[in-house]
């Protein structure tokens, strides 16, 4: 748990008021770093976490896990245990994720990896991947990270791993 502080968007010493419209919540560390030196307004970022797209199949999912991210089983798994980890906020580009979302996704990836290893001793490796944009193969425009369990001998020659997205480049020459 992190302590929250009330912060003035426009600091009082720069003419900011005590009105509600000029206040935001920041964690104690962020507030201490911001101090009264700038008028950075973080409220829009906080509000953006609630954005959902009514037409997005991932935005419609109600799953536990974390307030910023969650995990689901892939409906078209490459291997048994194939999971998708994604932010709750509707955002299509991996590179547009906010750092707290990346942190939540990373935490869930680690937890799911541990869970899979404890329940299936045949797992000997993982592929972790993101398709960012249609030209990279992204078909659902809501960021999702694939966690794909691998097993010894699940394919003849796995060397090259994710390089296989361009088949002629998978083999190291």
What do these predicted ranges mean?
Residues 1, 29, 55-59:
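Short, cysteine/histidine-rich loop/knuckle motifs that typically chelate Zn2+
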Residues 1-25:
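Histidine-centered nuclease catalytic patch
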Residues 1-9, 35-39, 64-67:
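Short Cys/His-rich "knuckle" micro-motifs
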Residues 8-15, 42-51, 70-71:
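Short cysteine/histidine-rich metal-coordination sites, predominantly Zn2+-binding motifs
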Residues 13, 34-36, 95:
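Activation segment
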Residues 23-45:
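Short Cys/His-centered divalent metal-binding micro-motifs
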Residues 47-173:
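HIT superfamily nucleotide-processing domains
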